[in-house]
Amino acid sequence: DGTPVRLRFDAPAGITTLELYVTSQKTGFRDEYINMVDADSCRMLINAAYEPTFEHLGDEFGKTILGFFTDEPGFMNEKGATLEDASTSSFIGRGDMALPWSDELARRLHEELSASWLAELRGLWTRDPAGARVRHTYMDIATQLYRACFDEQIGDWCRKRGVMHIGHVIEDKSCHTRLGQGAGHYFRAVAGQDMAGIDVVINQLAPSVDHGRYSYFHGAWNMEFFTYALAKLGSSAARLDPKKQGRCMAEVFGAFGWHEGLREMKWIADHMLVRGINWFTPHAFSMAPFPDWDCPPHFYAHGNNPQWPHFGQLMSYMNRTATLLSGGYAMRPVAILYHADAEWAGNAMPIERVAAELTRAQIDFDFVPAEAFEDEDRYEVSIADGLLTVNDCRYQAFVMPGASFIGAATAEAMRRMADAGVMVLAVDEVPGTFYDTDGAVELGGLVATPLADVARALASAGLQTVVPDTPQPWLRALRYKRVGETY
């Protein structure tokens, strides 16, 4: 509260470091925001917005009102800056960041780290390898609390009243694995939803621009992520969570500018469909007087959009195709390990690097989180006869992006995969240290495969969806089984 405090203590001989930890309800950014790691705080949102809606319109729930859409929630402990690689600076281990906190989070940290937990907290504000375990433990707890306190609490409330909970978090700028405006772990952040969700806006997709930095009015995008990882994050969560029934919604078309006509919209739709997105929110309609400067293009624009008479054809095409790609099973033979856990602990290759190589070679895949090998209540995993099966999704190969650290359960699963005949690859680096236990990492003599050779190795194992006569880096293909047909 601003009252000066005098601290008296007897310093030992030599150099002494004094660390003072303070909790506060204000960080200077979104101070009105609920606390995503506190169940009571998140319940305030339900009481203030959801309950009054049900009180007034409950008779229409499940009929006229099919659900609630949550748009871009996150920890919001800070805004964060954009780094040179177009990612957010809100990564755990940065020395000047205020961290999400609650009594329950502190209790679980104490439980996991035992009596020395306060002495280990300094690792949360450094990227020193010695702090890998406390960083991972903190983020593991924080993202589990985000899931339980916010997303699942809202989802459970909705389902009890016969409606769905859908929406998406901020995925860009690596927010999906970090704090700040991010939610720390994509799969946990959408775990309470009845559909997975993503959005693509402001020219985050552009034909033939699939790598490097692409400028926009607030900075630059990492185009490799949007082209090769974003949609697959959503469709992977849709497949791995039985509650979602293979459904993933994408906000599309919004804020691209007036240059985006129906031809580009069709290209964006195809980009999403072939990657498993089968529900859409066409985000480009405005009822404001023309011209409305907010997030054009606008489909109708009070008759000023000359392509409006043909817009229905695009919607009809998207509706028919999305229907054909619903209720069935996409054949994706490769699992790529989601890198969030490894990044919290230390150096880690982002998933889009591996995804780009596989996509250009027509090798389909899902992203699979490390918690699949840890959480038996949420994931049913079997490893046998050359297959890794996660909640009925079957994979013939497992690819781990380069990382310095690995979890004990993931390492054990990889050993079992290799013994069962599943193809196992570690890209560029084999981790040598655990982030959640002591001891040496033993992966059965696994050696690193250079990133440039990964697609070739998988293709040699017959894992391409289609096999072109010559390399076709821009060809995309999906094989889908539905109602006794494969197409």
Question: Can you annotate each of these PLM segments?
Answer:
Residues 57-67, 72-487:
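Carbohydrate-binding surfaces of carbohydrate-active enzymes
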Residues 1-71:
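Mature N-terminal, pre-catalytic/accessory segment of carbohydrate-active enzymes
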